[in-house]
Amino acid sequence: KYIIVQTHTNKDEISREISRVLIEKKLVACVNVYPAASSIFRYNNTIVEENEYLLQAKTTSDKFLDIKTVIEQLHNYETPEIISIAILDGNADYLTWINNEIN
């Protein structure tokens, strides 16, 4: 039921815009933005190393498709990472807070 939705971008302004829109639309309770993620990946048959912003948003699984749509609309990558990670357990008060923020 509770999930973390994760994505990366190489632009600070994109990370902030995605975060703000998701919170404004009450799709997520909060977004943690980590500015120093070092990523190594293949793009157009070339190995690329890039500093990226990691975004982790706390929410519930019923919001995932709407979150995915927002990220796809605002993201600067051709194929952005948009994944869901299950929260198997947690502080009950924190999980209640997530519910209160998105409902």
Please give the residue ranges for each predicted region:
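Positively charged, small/polar-rich N-terminal and surface patches that mediate targeting and assembly
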Residues: K1-N103
